[in-house]
Amino acid sequence: MHSDKLKSHFDNKVVWLTGASSGIGRALAIALSKYDCQLYLSSRTHDQLVKTRDMCDQPENVHIEAGDLSVLETNKTICKKIEAQSGQLDIAILNAGTCEYVDVNNFDSALFERLITHNYLSMVYGIEASLPLLKESADAQLVGMSSTAGYLGIPRSEAYGSTKAAIINMLRALKVSLKPNNIDVSVICPGFVKTELTDRNDFPMPAMISAELAAEHIVKGIVKRTHEI
């Protein structure tokens, strides 16, 4: 894709990116910082967000808003700060989440609760907090991170895959529901990406790509307004 098209898409936009302290989120922050947008980064770990900002091309355009995104009020507070500082929000990229694997010999409902909270509900809260601002934007996009695991019943991924399937379903529905509000909705469904999370895996991961390459594909998908990236 021509660099001018990428540039024109993000220039003068206000972007909120969650889960920006590591992995795909960090790579996305670095990729987006090349453009003249105001970039707000969120995650639970302030120090790691500072590291992400230090790696960005235009750190003066990168703002840190740390907090626990599994709490609704945290999301609302961050969006209020974005509105107060920048007056608008054009693109919300809700990427925060984690991964744990199920042991069927020690089936633990608490693990499911954790992943539902951190993967699914954190996105629901981010949507609730950001929608009022996105509805005011003339060119809004809502983007959520899922996974190919959301399409497949992978052993040990019963909890993780379920949350990702829920995200796919929700964003497919919102694509239709938010059309009258002129909000484009995309869902990101990567395969294996080399990150701190996948470094912990103890099984083969075919066709793995780097976080940087994943971020490149995601940015292009956002510009094309592709629903499933």
Residue spans of the language-model regions?
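Conserved glycine-rich cofactor-binding loop
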Residues: 21-22
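Conserved glycine-rich Rossmann-like NAD(P)H-binding loop of the short-chain dehydrogenase/reductase
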Residues: 35-52
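The beta1-alpha1 cofactor-binding region of Rossmann-like NAD(H)/NADP(H)-dependent oxidoreductases
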Residues: 66-77, 109
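Substrate-binding pocket helix/loop in short-chain dehydrogenase/reductase
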Residues: 103-116
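Active-site helix of classical SDR
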Residues: 127, 163
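Residue(s) in the substrate-gating loop at a strand-loop-helix junction
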Residues: 147
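C-terminal helical subdomain
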Residues: 187, 203-229
